[in-house]
């Protein structure tokens, strides 16, 4: 299957220029293509995966991806999708973010020979104002720039000249990469269409209308309920394991809605049509088993992290679901219970009823007695029904904390104060 046809089957194309021309080009030759990301932070989140999954598919189809880290444009800020001006970062912060994102990209795309990393600071920093105006500014019509959505949406609230010129800088990127590396395709999110087409126009003005260059954007990813994909009540889901643990990352995908899971399997995994169709049938006939969600979580966690991180996430998930947490390490407990209600306690042993009330896990002694007697309370993986039981924080997990399970799903973490 041609890469363009595969992307169409996966519903991964929003807009593209000259579909037949791009299909013919990718059918007969190996092309170079690029996608850019500005270093606004020191980690990508799962929203960034959307265009880079497409880049990975091109790579697997025998094409060569170039990843542009915007060390130059990152000092200015992309107005796309913004209603307000970005706060400018220091050069030191930008460079730190460039280094961090470069490392993440190499992990996703593999060996240096299979992907080329570039930084637009290398050429934009050498561009003088006079050269910018004479060699590039002359090729841009202000009326055309004002009509593009990325600018038009900001005219009422106001846009600085700095952000107004962003599309020129991104166009210079495309032109520079085309001239130096024969890059013929730029990929971006749906909000990048205006910037991408501006780059195509610049190349054709500089190189001639016969230049074989193309643009392709990915659809805006929305959940079945109409809300934006990638956000949770706790904020963004990051690719950096220090910001979002592999367990939390795994759980995010595991908890996807039946209405969304097949769409995400198409987009975020490398499973083929036969495998995805089989999982779609299971969603239809046996939704309670959630096999599609489990496969989605496995595939994406393995791709972003690795097999070891996936196995750890699965181990924690199974332990917390079953309540058998005794075999978990301290680090695994902390990872799995990072977002549960947490209280501070002393090392002193105390009667379970009093202890549950003191930690505010139970609202009253009456409720505490009822839950303990009814078998609803587990301490460090053991169900406790004895009202005379003494909670001793020093007995498990090196005396660092006590894990409480109330009912089947509610966990609490009581940390021992130093």
From Swiss-Prot:
It is an enzyme of class 6 (ligase). Keywords: Aminoacyl-tRNA synthetase, ATP-binding, Cytoplasm, Ligase, Nucleotide-binding, Protein biosynthesis, RNA-binding. Its EC number is 6.1.1.1. Coiled coil: none annotated. It catalyses: tRNA(Tyr) + L-tyrosine + ATP = L-tyrosyl-tRNA(Tyr) + AMP + diphosphate + H(+). One of its GO terms (biological process) is tyrosyl-tRNA aminoacylation. GO terms for cellular component: cytosol. It comes from the Bacteria. A motif ('HIGH' region) lies at residues 39-48. PROSITE patterns: AA_TRNA_LIGASE_I, S4. Its main location: cytoplasm. Belongs to the class-I aminoacyl-tRNA synthetase family. TyrS type 1 subfamily. Homodimer. This is Tyrosine--tRNA ligase 1.
